[in-house]
Design a protein with these regions (language model features):
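Polytopic transmembrane helical bundles with strong interfacial aromatic enrichment
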Residues: 1-154
Length: 154
């Protein structure tokens, strides 16, 4: 029962992180460059969406480590090379996803500061890079979720 709860919490946290990043990317693409809506999105909503993604990433890390500890105890440290390879890929993806997300969050903070100083073009200049970072997180997260289904079966 514990292992199932950990696994589902892990999967839901991953889905929330990917979903939050997908929402950010969709909103970023839908809003007109330099529009008041885009500035308002960056100034008021983007950090909240990113905070949700970051909390989900923290839960993902915690449940991943807990799940690995449980599985390790059950298998006595005896994992196949394929399992270890897939696990290493998932860990690598997580690290790169976290780097992309935190970079975008730093850019967002700088843009919010620029908007507060009445620099109206800041959001339009930064949004394409922020959207690309979130799309990258979505793509890598989708791969990680697919790899996770493989790990469940092994």
């Amino acid at each position: 029962m514990l292992q199932t709860t950990i696994l589902w919490t892990h999967a839901v946290a991953g889905a929330i992180w990917i979903g939050a990043c997908a929402c950010f990317a969709i909103a970023g693409l839908a809003l007109g460059a330099g529009s008041p809506e885009q500035r308002n999105f960056v100034a008021k909503s983007a950090s909240k969406i990113d905070a949700l993604g970051l909390v989900a990433a923290a839960v993902l890390l915690a449940t991943g480590l807990t799940g690995l500890t449980v599985v390790t105890a059950l298998h006595g440290f005896a994992f196949s090379t394929a399992f270890m390879t897939v696990l290493a890929i998932k860990i690598g993806l997580f690290v790169v996803m976290l780097v992309a997300m935190t970079w975008s969050m730093r850019v967002g903070a700088a843009v919010r500061a620029a908007i507060a100083r009445e620099h109206t073009g800041a959001a339009a200049a930064a949004m394409p890079q922020m959207v690309k970072a979130h799309v990258a997180v979505v793509a890598m997260g989708a791969v990680a979720l697919i790899l996770g289904t493989w790990l469940m079966g092994s």
